[in-house]
Amino acid sequence: MFEFVKLKNVCVNLSHRSILTDISLSLISNRVLTLIGPNGAGKSTLVRIILGLIKPNSGTIIRSNNLSVGYVPQKLHLNTLLPITVERFMKLSRKTNNIKIEEMLKRVKAESLKFCQLQKLSGGEMQRILFAKALLNNPNLLVLDEPTQGVDVMGQLALYKLINEIRHELQCAILIVSHDLNFVMAKTDDVICLNNHICCSGTPETVCNNLEFISIFGLKRVQELAIYHHNHNHIHNF
């Protein structure tokens, strides 16, 4: 296993308010780490720190020299007055070509969408296109912000199956930010529950049994998660 990014005791303050306190984590090859927490917990700020978009007030960030990041945003804001095809959108990435674009679209099973208008894609189709675009630079770190938002259940299962295939093929680290606790607990290796600080972390089972996690999400919700995880502890074939 290889650490692509490591945070040590990272703190962020904005307008004299503590946003993140004493955050330490590692993003490791071939492992999926999922970040959960209530609104205002600092998840977006932590992602921006990891992406290098903002600097912390204190703490240490160590990135591997060969770090290459692929980012799938939570939502793509499109100007409906400026129609754009999937192919043209993919070409907005630097250092790409038609062969690479076709390869990535095929990899995410979206080659049939190449000449479609982005504005006409379903939620699941759009996520596949964003995923394909993120793969163009052969990332060793994939950051996925709410990847299942606006995607139906079958699409979510297929998307997580794809994520699992990609991480094994590329041996990349994957960070997922998600509110969908059901799929988080069934499809991730490690979980960090954030509420301006790290409330708890570890395997999904460990986090589900943590009192601070239960306090944030409620006992009933945690019990539902336990039932869901039990009923889905097997492999779906699509």
From Swiss-Prot:
Residues 5-220 form the ABC transporter domain. Belongs to the ABC transporter superfamily. Zinc importer (TC 3.A.1.15.5) family. GO terms for biological process: response to zinc ion. This is Zinc import ATP-binding protein ZnuC. Its EC number is 7.2.2.20. GO terms for molecular function: ABC-type zinc transporter activity; ATP binding; ATP hydrolysis activity. ATP binds at residues 37-44. Its main location: membrane. It comes from the Bacteria. GO terms for cellular component: plasma membrane. The keyword Ion transport applies. It comes from Buchnera aphidicola subsp. Acyrthosiphon pisum (strain APS). Coiled coil: none annotated. It holds the Pfam family ABC_tran.
